[in-house]
Amino acid sequence: MDAAHTVLLLIGYQNDYFSPTGILHDVVEESANPQTVLSNTLDLIQRLAPSPVYMVDTPIVFTDDYRELVKPIGILKTIKELGAFRVGSDGVKTIPELQAFADRIITIPGKRGLNAFSNTALEILFQQWGISDIVIAGAISSICVDSTGRHAHGLGYQVTILSDCTLGRNSVEQAFYCEQIFPLYAQTMTHHELLQKLDIHPVNL
């Protein structure tokens, strides 16, 4: 894995998931350890900041009336019914912890569904940057992380999903996806293993 041709794709790091007052905060059980996932992600970003690895944030944002969701089902129906990720709301904002790295993380708008490539410029940008490896972190493992990872694999990218930087709805779901689903199309590893693979050594910050 070459750092100069690798991108860290950050999915769902928004207030509606990670803030205690977020509309979808209760979708994630405490057993999934959301604060640990966030802490691991921030540690990874800090370590990668001086490196040539690209870092991209893909927030999901819906219009006021959710007109882009025609007869939604599943999680998208829940999002519409609860009013989550609505444009202009506090819940749609990227969490402050990630905003602190705004000079290093590129935000790509347009995501309005489960797959981060849909309705965004990700594929074009990754081609321009010469990306070969996509590393995925974020929420929710069984939904947006899995959908995006499968699509990236289908496009021919080498996909890595970080087991300690992705968030399932509970610990059982997270373990199942990391052990049984993700390995079907991706490498699964911790962020420490990724840093070793990229030859980025821990430093005291």
List PLM regions with ranges.
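Active-site-adjacent betaalpha module
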Residues: 1-7, 17, 47-51, 66-68, ...
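A short, N-terminal amphipathic alpha-helix
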Residues: 36-54
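Glycine-rich N-terminal loop/short-helix segment of MobA-like nucleotidyltransferase
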Residues: 16-30
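Catalytic-core segment of enzymes that process non-peptidic bonds
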Residues: 57-65
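Active-site loop/turn elements of alpha/beta-hydrolase fold enzymes
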Residues: 13, 60, 164
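A short acidic, glycine-rich active-site loop
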Residues: 27-39, 79-89
